């Protein structure tokens, strides 16, 4: 992808000229690859949550072509680039952009990245390049968003969803964990006799409500340990939590007894945030 137009993984593409260019530039190439994966690590991705390794190739290409491999990891530099790179990673994972025909996907992206006029990582131009391809489109339909918000905590996609929602966090300097807002332990011990009717019991015990993105947040490692199984209302009040930054609905009762209202309101809130995050 770095040194020729045909990026297919074929023996014929590794001619003497390409091999020579790799040899001459190997230290910069290696450094670009290393810092790209270090960025993913800083953003909280691991081998489980970052399944489509091809998604890092455009980032490596951009870092190398802009010659920023020695500075991109510095906290105060290239903040907009890193924000857009992280957005690309999250949405490309959720949409399964590299689920098939990865060569054609990378060829399209290379055409965008080859533009010498780009000033920051060109997420919007990449999105536009796939706008007419339903299979690779980076847009999120209402139906898709509904499904995304049902993503379970242990799903490989869960971290990508939360990282997209919590795009305002300081990923370069803080490590974040997935955390239940209303503690999971409260739901696991419920019995039908705890409720006036079976429908309410079914709502509380449905994993699509209590164990999905609708009841999850990204919390710093230290805060997550201290929060433990504390009631949501108590945690918010005792720690003077900023509801807006935590993506918690305002002007509702956060008691466990009002969990259905919490889920309804948070679904509306997260839907708006997702649409805003992707520019729709």
Question: Where are each of the predicted segments found?
Answer:
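A cross-family structural signal marking well-folded subdomains
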Residues: 1-134
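Feature representing long, continuous alpha-helical segments
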Residues: 57, 83, 87, 176-179, ...
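Short beta-strand-alpha-helix junction that forms the catalytic/metal-binding core
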Residues: 176, 188-225
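C-terminal, well-folded lobe of enzymatic/effector domains
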Residues: 244-280
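Active-site-proximal structural scaffolding
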Residues: 22, 29, 33, 52-55, ...
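Extended, charge-rich low-complexity regions and/or helical-solenoid scaffolds
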Residues: 172, 205-206, 279-280
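Polybasic, low-complexity binding patches
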Residues: 209-210, 227-250
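Intrinsically disordered, low-complexity N-proximal targeting/linker segments that flank membranes
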Residues: 90-181, 186, 190-194
């Amino acid at each position: 992808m770095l040194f020729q137009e045909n990026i297919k993984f074929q023996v014929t593409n590794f001619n003497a000229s390409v091999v020579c260019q790799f040899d001459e530039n190997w230290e910069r190439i290696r450094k670009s690859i290393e810092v790209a994966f270090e960025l993913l690590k800083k953003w909280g991705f691991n081998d489980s949550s970052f399944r489509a390794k091809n998604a890092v190739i455009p980032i490596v290409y951009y870092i190398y072509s802009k010659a920023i491999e020695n500075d991109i990891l510095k906290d105060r530099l290239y903040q907009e680039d890193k924000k857009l790179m992280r957005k690309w990673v999250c949405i490309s994972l959720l949409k399964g952009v590299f689920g098939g025909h990865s060569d054609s996907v990378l060829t399209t992206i290379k055409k965008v990245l080859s533009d010498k006029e780009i000033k920051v990582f060109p997420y919007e131009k990449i999105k536009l390049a796939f706008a007419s391809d339903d299979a690779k489109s980076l847009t999120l339909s209402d139906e898709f968003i509904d499904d995304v918000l049902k993503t379970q905590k242990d799903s490989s996609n869960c971290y990508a969803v939360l990282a997209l929602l919590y795009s305002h966090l300081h990923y370069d300097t803080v490590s974040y964990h997935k955390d239940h807002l209303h503690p999971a332990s409260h739901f696991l011990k419920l019995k039908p006799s705890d409720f006036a009717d079976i429908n309410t019991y079914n709502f509380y015990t449905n994993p699509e409500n209590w164990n999905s993105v609708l009841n999850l947040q990204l919390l710093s490692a230290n805060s997550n340990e201290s929060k433990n199984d504390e009631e949501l209302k108590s945690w918010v009040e005792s720690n003077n939590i900023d509801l807006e930054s935590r993506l918690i609905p305002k002007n509702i009762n956060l008691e466990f007894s009002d969990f259905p209202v919490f889920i309804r309101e948070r679904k509306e809130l997260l839907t708006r945030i997702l649409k805003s995050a992707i520019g729709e």
